Swiss-Prot record:
Family, as annotated: Belongs to the CbiD family.
Name of the gene: cbiD
Organism: Rhodospirillum rubrum (strain ATCC 11170 / ATH 1.1.1 / DSM 467 / LMG 4362 / NCIMB 8255 / S1)
Pfam families given in the database record: CbiD (PF01888)
Protein name: Cobalt-precorrin-5B C(1)-methyltransferase
Domain of life: Bacteria
Length: 357
């Protein structure tokens, strides 16, 4: 089965923005003295029309609240199963629509995001969707508060704290649909990380492949955690965004195997989409002056770690060579962008074993 077929066989889900809008639509029905619709149908930006079952419903004088359980389908989304509630409260005529961050929804505290500092982290498309359902209900003057149960703790497992979104989650989505394993959320977070770094005047950021490389890079460079952009396997996504939105200095930090893939030209470092080229590593050892015995043993290796261990035992700077080659590939992607590139190769113990740029 190819990846396209595999993606089609997986169950899609709905974004936090779609869930919040569905909850709001139900609350608005109750606010105008109609029964809560259950399920509540919602038309998404691309025309899909899912129905959302209500998990909670409540009314009071001049207000109504409804809740929906977030269903991310087969995507490994940290918000899957979270209760998302919308509370609509009538305001005096002329007040307009006012969005509030309820419990578990974050507040923007740094520039560079598509929302102003101090605003609730309800992104532009979900806001537009909510505005549309309010208009359809004939309600122009409302306070709309979105809450996510346990959102503050869930947010600690996301990029929000580093992006300066504090107190909870973001209400996200551009299409309303979560495509399983599309990685769109990760790419979105990479881009927002670059935007925030630029807006706050950072001259040096570190793209890391994981927690080990992050710790090693920060210790080695003396930078704080807010310099980190957790690119995971998506080095290409980071580089392509930096090409158009440059930051003066980028350090790429990762494990030897992943960065050997980058040195070979791979821009998606996931094992399903790029494999370590063991023969290429053996050829590099030969170019560094390895004996034929070492080269032959490297050619028989099963993993990149085995080749690195051979190189270290022979006193050959293979990791440094990989760092320089990876930096060359990165610069080629960046083109004429004014970004200085350096690379740190980190072993599994968290030690920097190669550096180049």
């Amino acid at each position: 089965m190819d990846e396209a077929d595999e993606g089609r066989s997986l169950r899609r889900g709905w974004t936090t923005g779609a869930c919040a809008t569905a909850a709001l639509k139900a609350a608005l029905e109750a606010l105008v003295d109609r029964p809560f619709p259950d399920p509540v149908a919602l038309t998404l930006p691309r025309g899909e029309r899912p129905a959302f079952a209500l998990a909670t419903r409540e009314t009071g004088p001049g207000w109504a609240r409804a809740g929906v359980i977030k269903d991310a389908g087969d995507d490994p989304d940290v918000t899957h199963g979270a209760l998302i509630e919308a509370t609509a409260r009538l305001l005096p005529k002329g007040s307009g629509l006012i969005f509030r961050a309820g419990s578990g929804v974050g507040t923007v505290t740094k520039p560079g995001l598509p929302l102003a500092v101090g605003e609730p982290a309800i992104n532009p498309v979900p806001r537009a969707m909510m505005t549309e359902v309010a208009t359809a209900a004939g309600l122009a003057d409302l306070e709309i508060s979105i809450a996510v149960a346990q959102g503050a703790s869930i947010a600690l497992r996301t990029w929000n704290p580093r992006l300066g979104i504090l107190g909870g989650l973001s209400i996200l989505g551009t299409t309303g649909v979560v495509v399983p394993y599309s990685c769109s959320a990760w790419i979105h977070s990479i881009r927002r990380g670059v935007d925030v770094a630029r807006a706050t005047g950072r001259a040096h950021v570190v793209g890391t492949t994981g927690a080990t490389s992050e710790r090693a890079a920060l210790d080695h460079l003396g930078l704080d955690a807010e310099a980190v952009i957790d690119m995971g396997d998506f080095v290409g996504g980071l580089l392509k965004y930096l090409r158009d939105h440059p930051i003066p200095h980028l350090t790429i930090a990762g494990g030897f195997a992943k960065l050997s893939k980058l040195a070979d030209g791979a821009l998606d470092l996931h094992s399903k989409r790029a494999q370590v080229d063991i023969p290429a590593l053996a050829r590099r050892l030969a170019a560094l002056g390895a004996t034929q015995a070492v080269v032959s043993e490297a050619e028989r290796a099963n993993t990149a770690l085995e080749v690195l261990t051979l190189a270290q035992a022979a006193g050959l700077p293979l990791a440094t060579a990989i760092a320089f080659e990876a930096a060359t590939v990165a610069r080629a992607v960046l083109g004429e962008a004014p970004v200085r590139v350096s690379v740190l190769v980190v072993d599994r113990g968290g030690r920097v074993v190669g550096e180049g740029g």
